[in-house]
Amino acid sequence: MLSFATKEHGLANKNFYKVPNGPDSYVSSCIGINAVERKVKGLPARAPEAFPPPIEPIAFLVEQAANSRLPGHYHQADQFQVFVSGEGSFGIKPITGMTVHYAMAFTPYAPIHATTAPIEYYTLRNGWDPGAQWMPEKKSGLMARVHPYRHGLGLVPALVGEKDGPTNIQGLLEQNVIPFEPDGLGATLYQSTSAVTIKGPSPATGRGQYWLILKGQCSINEHAGSQRSMAFVSPDEPAPTVIAGAEGVSVLMLQFPKR
């Protein structure tokens, strides 16, 4: 069954969290209950799942404080991060606009630096993760190297209505953000300036998809969505029916690789 959440739903589940060895932050739960929310609400900890974990969408927005640094770490689930606001750097690479980062399980990444303004990013997972494994303290957990390191960054093209963004699109514009790989990993930006039907790849070609509305409005199956609404589609479901609003939409589709 498709999971759907609006921006308002996430902000209604917003919690302050002080990273033990890092910055102050706010975490807004959009889909599922993540490890931070469990800690804040005093819920019992969940044990790690065997890899790959069962399909379970968990999505949240992180607001990382200005002039802060989130240390390097890794997770035990595959994930995407979509940077939507603020400027900073990811490792040595600058973040100056909307950016997509993917990191497969057991792949160290970061640090994430926020500059003079807070930085906001969505973390999107398709399975349970018990929390960050900080480096270098948890380096021993990587010694077996059962899972190859795999991560990368993709810049989101200018959106409709932005400077240098597309105008008067005839039909639908599809732009690669993360080029698709044979196992299904990839991300595509779909843009329109009118009401069109958007057809993405079959979810069966990967291990689940997130659809994140970056601008405008569209419906995803029976759900009406606007900016920063999102949906998760399991790999055993049909491709969602996505219909842009009368003035168009910019919507990002992110697909996890098969395991």
Residue ranges and their predicted role:
Residues 1-54, 134-188:
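A short, N-terminal "cap"/entry segment at the start of jelly-roll beta-barrel domains
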Residues 46-89, 93, 98:
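The feature marks the first
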Residues 52, 67-80, 113-117, 196-211, ...:
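Short, low-complexity cationic-aromatic patches
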Residues 53-66, 181-197:
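Short, flexible domain-boundary/linker segments around small modular repeats
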Residues 65, 75-93, 200-221, 227:
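Glycine- and acidic-residue-biased ligand/ion/polar-headgroup-sensing regions
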Residues 94-95, 105-134, 224-226, 235-259:
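Ligand-binding loop in jelly-roll beta-barrel domains
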Residues 99, 228-229:
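Structural motif
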